[in-house]
Amino acid sequence: MRIEIAIAVISDLHIGSTVALFPDRYALPDGQILRASTAQKWILGNWNNFWSEFHGIRATRKAIIVNGEFCEGVHHSTPQIVGTAELMEEIAVEVMRPHVAKVDELFVVKGSGAHSKPGGFSDEAVARELGAKRCPSFGTRSSYRWRISAGGVMLDCLHHVTGSGAPWTKGNNLRRAVLEHLYTSMERKERPADLLIRSHVHAYGHWEQSGCHAYVTPSWKLADEHAHKIAPGSLLPIGGLFVLINRGRAEVIPRLYSPQTGKASTL
């Protein structure tokens, strides 16, 4: 059965991090070969499975939403990176190009300044190279916010969302996002979105209120040194979302891939 619209939603690729999505092999201009680690090969395998499933969906129109942060960037003196921000952008283009070529539109949301450069210029550079859709307000290839009307379904896409780190406060960030959105939409006399897409914190979540569904997307990055500090012991799944739209209704399918806990040592 062919549906009207299929959208793949991904975010926080963090390409350039030593613990994030990376090609199996990448040749630098000077001839040095960078190769994916064992962990990165696991991420890449799931990435390939995600896209194989998405490209197999029969739809009249297809799109990709990258909800911020193609690249890790050079930040906070971290040693867990592979090179310059510009190199990361080149790798991101190579990783994304085969999938962008198979869809009708690419929408790019700007991420945080730490990863995406001030003003989101890293996301903008990759978006421009990939021919992403222009923002109707500013003419740029990326934007901090996208409101997308797709087959009668309104999506509201922003990279940032507040955190909800402790298990007993899980979901508070989504509840806040939905209620703030509904309130401000009412104040502005705007139509509330059917789907809120948020990212940044890498922890998948979903909450619904009054027909407004909010989702936080997972990332394509495992825990780095900073994550081990602020959330010790956490094992967040990686992955993305499929949004399938037919007859004015949306079905959101999360695709989550969970890393395994490390083997225990024997005394």
PLM regions and their residue ranges:
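Active-site metal-binding loops of divalent metal-dependent hydrolases
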Residues: 11-14, 68-71, 111-114, 160-162, ...
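A structural motif corresponding to the C-terminal end of an alpha-helix
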Residues: 53-62, 94-107, 189-192, 246-248
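An acidic, phosphate/nucleotide-engaging active-site surface
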Residues: 117-158, 162-170
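N-terminal active-site segment of His-dependent metallophosphoesterases
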Residues: 1-87
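Conserved beta-sheet core of the metallophosphoesterase superfamily
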Residues: 151-156, 161-255
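Residue-level marker for buried hydrophobic side chains located in beta-strands
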Residues: 7-9, 64-66, 108, 156, ...
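Short catalytic/ligand-binding loop motif for oxyanion handling, primarily in non-cytosolic enzymes
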Residues: 16-18, 72-76, 115-119, 165-166, ...
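Active-site neighborhood of divalent metal-dependent phosphoester bond hydrolases
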Residues: 35, 43-44, 71-139
